């Protein structure tokens, strides 16, 4: 009895508190949905001008989604009379659209590149030609899910190739959808096809709904994806002279400078965007991030790109705004020589694995025995890291996360290969005494220069 009385008391107390909360919420203007979740109806700090807007979407969404309206109010879109409708309102039946809650019209809940293309045709065309578009998606999904048109578009990208996929896609299959939607896909969906057939997601870099130049020019934007053991561009940049200039003095830079011809007055040192995208010096703004690259650095064994000579000129024109001709030429010669050394070590690792392949001593399944990881890490982590580190000035990544790790894993690879050969009654690898030095690697596989 006592128990029931207590629970009844508890129940009434909860009920009354609930009622009070509800009344309170209604009084101060909170919004409660069918599931009992409460949302603040207005947070009061509206961007200048937006409170006078007569746009029906804005008028209602100020209460429904105040965060979005606030960000939109800060944007150049709002001050240039671009409206919510321009990006979201579509015909009934438009692929990916839904009927707007309580209204007759249809909206795209996630606006697509097709809407941006109405006004920013050039940026979209450049983006579509880059590895941020379909190649990013194909890197984990393969080409099977592409429509005929998308396949043709993918095949028309001159720089889509160059990087052999060496088992990487098998990680996607091994880990399964529940994991990869938070992993591979979070980064690689920058180039995923949308329901309406357009490609990619501009908001992978341009955070909605402000679409601010300052935000997208800052290197933190790129570090959403260009980070970690296999592509540590953010870490490398942070320890370079350029990154240190940004981290210690960037507050004073002219982040909102008009795009097209940004100068050294605006940016005394470069960010990722300056070197790879901004109109700077004689190089025009581009959304094709491959447009200034010489090498396929992400490759196991790097080769030069189809249009590498023109690309290199475009990158060097950026450097030349701040550095001398000789400085830039010396730097490029040194970078090319480093690529040659890393290529040589990776070829040595291929040479070491060859007898296992020839004698059927490896399992068919990728990543099921330690040797698969050792072999993979040599090029996918350490080789890449050393190359990126040299080209973007991160000494620690060239040395301790790069060359040193290569030597370490080559020594382990030798033990792992020899163990398998001996188990099969075969001779161990015949390697020179100074293995795994670069001289030994050159002796075994020859020089790779030019
Ligand atoms: C009378 C109020 C009202 C008007 C007018 C209005 N909206 Fe909405 N809108 C809402 C509400 C309420 C939601 C649902 C919010 C939620 O689910 O949390 C919503 C949701 C949305 C969504 C998300 C839909 C989804 O399924 O995720 C979009 C996009 C949107 N509105 C765009 C617009 C555009 C564009 C206009 C003008 C053409 C507009 N809205 C006009 C109240 C309004
Ligand atoms: C310049 C184009 C553009 C304008 C203008 C714009 N949006 Fe969006 N909006 C987008 C994009 C792009 C996305 C989806 C981003 C993604 O895929 O991650 C989005 C997402 C949304 C979402 C769903 C995501 C969420 O966070 O709930 C809502 C709701 C929305 N917008 C409402 C609005 C409203 C209301 C306005 C006007 C006040 C507006 N948008 C103006 C481009 C725009
Ligand atoms: C209806 C036309 C229209 C649509 C649709 C549109 N924009 Fe814009 N956008 C503009 C205009 C106009 C400006 C201002 C141009 C200027 O300042 O020179 C602008 C400016 C920008 C800027 C530069 C902001 C700045 O501070 O200068 C970015 C970034 C941008 N848009 C991205 C997008 C993206 C991404 C989409 C799609 C999600 C999109 N826009 C959709 C018309 C549009
Ligand atoms: C943190 C973001 C991130 C995650 C997670 C991620 N990648 Fe990547 N991936 C990148 C970036 C950035 C590059 C580009 C490296 C470069 O060019 O320096 C890349 C490059 C690649 C490449 C080489 C490019 C090509 O077109 O062949 C493949 C293949 C690839 N990733 C597959 C995957 C798979 C499969 C997964 C999941 C098992 C995955 N990635 C997870 C960001 C990511
Ligand atoms: C890899 C990140 C990234 C992606 C993805 C991206 N942008 Fe940009 N965008 C930038 C950067 C960085 C700038 C600033 C360039 C500069 O410094 O002038 C910029 C500038 C812009 C501008 C204003 C500059 C100008 O030349 O007028 C527009 C408009 C724009 N982007 C539209 C888009 C559209 C549309 C998409 C999707 C197809 C897109 N962006 C995808 C990084 C990106
Ligand atoms: C949402 C994730 C994401 C963001 C954010 C992002 N990238 Fe990427 N980026 C990728 C992926 C994935 C690849 C590899 C694509 C491939 O090769 O298949 C890539 C490749 C590249 C490449 C090599 C292109 C080539 O042709 O090999 C450059 C350069 C690059 N990104 C620069 C940038 C810069 C600069 C920024 C910031 C302004 C940026 N990225 C932001 C995911 C991202
Ligand atoms: C000083 C200019 C500069 C800055 C700053 C810079 N990069 Fe680079 N980046 C380069 C050069 C040069 C290369 C090598 C180009 C080549 O192949 O010739 C490169 C290579 C790359 C690659 C490798 C592409 C491939 O072939 O696999 C990626 C990805 C990349 N940078 C992204 C970034 C990101 C992200 C940032 C900021 C965190 C950044 N870069 C900062 C100049 C720069
Ligand atoms: C906007 C100006 C600017 C641009 C563009 C620029 N740099 Fe720099 N660079 C600097 C500054 C500033 C430093 C830091 C100098 C110091 O450490 O005293 C620096 C340092 C360097 C260093 C280290 C030099 C040393 O003595 O330690 C290298 C290497 C370098 N830059 C290469 C490049 C390359 C390659 C490019 C083009 C891909 C480039 N930079 C583009 C301004 C620039």
Regions from the language model: what does each represent?
Residues 2-450:
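Short sequence/structural segments immediately N-terminal
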